[in-house]
Amino acid sequence: KYHEFLARYPDLETLAEAPTDEVKATWKPLGYNIRPVRLQMIAREVQQEYGGTIPETPADLQKLKGIGKYTAAAVSCFGYNKPVPLVDTNVDRVLQRGFYGKNSSETAKDENTVWELAETLVPQDNPYDYNQALMDFGATVCTARKPLCLFCPMQTFCLAYPVST
């Protein structure tokens, strides 16, 4: 159904100009029905404020209503290959364990501290691949429950190794 949505609205201009009820009806099978309204609102804002070109930097993207820090970073990195960090739940866990030693609430660093650390780690070359790999690593190896510490390539420097669960 997502591909049908993209086929019907292949660009920002088409989405921005479509009747909202039509956009909502096309999206309905995908669930989370506030999303098409927000997407259309952003498409209209990009058309009006940026001449139809999606901004490249997280700072400019966050000026769009409804775009937060993570989404702005994701668009900047995955859409424009900009070397910006992405910190989702999985990445947060990897960085908390690897660089701060734990993932408990007593020792967990605040969100800004983790984002600042993540920013120092993103390579200038291939930030897309790096961010994807780090998210995948947190989802498959450094998992919330039963992390695979024995197979972890970060063992030699991970401050939480081995994680006891």
What kind of region is each of these model predictions?
Residues 1-164:
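Catalytic cores of DNA base-excision repair glycosylases
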